[in-house]
Amino acid sequence: MGVKLEVFRMTIYLTFPVAMFWIANQAEWFEDYVIQRKRELWPPEKEDQPQELEDFKERIRKQREERLLRAAQQSS
């Protein structure tokens, strides 16, 4: 009984990881679950999003220049 049980346990220990790797590496499964989930979490950028970022950078740059100009005028 003990030897048969050990052989059964060893078979399960070896079969389970191999089966999980085989299932997880299926291309259809990967596309359906992983890629789709990634698209849900991080949707593609909108067309106007990069422009908004550039506008924000420009506003910050102008504010910084104005601050430096005021500081230079006050110190002289």
Curated annotation (Swiss-Prot):
Entry's localization field: Membrane; Mitochondrion; Mitochondrion inner membrane
Cellular component aspect of the GO annotation: mitochondrial inner membrane
Main location: membrane
Transmembrane spans: 7-24
Keyword Membrane: yes
Pfam family membership, one: Pet100
Biological-process GO terms, alphabetical: mitochondrial cytochrome c oxidase assembly
Keyword Protein biosynthesis among UniProt keywords: no
Keywords: Membrane, Mitochondrion, Mitochondrion inner membrane, Transit peptide, Transmembrane, Transmembrane helix
UniProt cross-references to InterPro entries, sorted A to Z: Pet100
Subunit structure: Interacts with COX7A2.
Family stated for the protein in its record: Belongs to the PET100 family.
Protein's UniProt name: Protein PET100 homolog, mitochondrial
Organism for this UniProt entry: Sus scrofa
Taxonomy of the source species: Eukaryota, Metazoa, Chordata, Craniata, Vertebrata
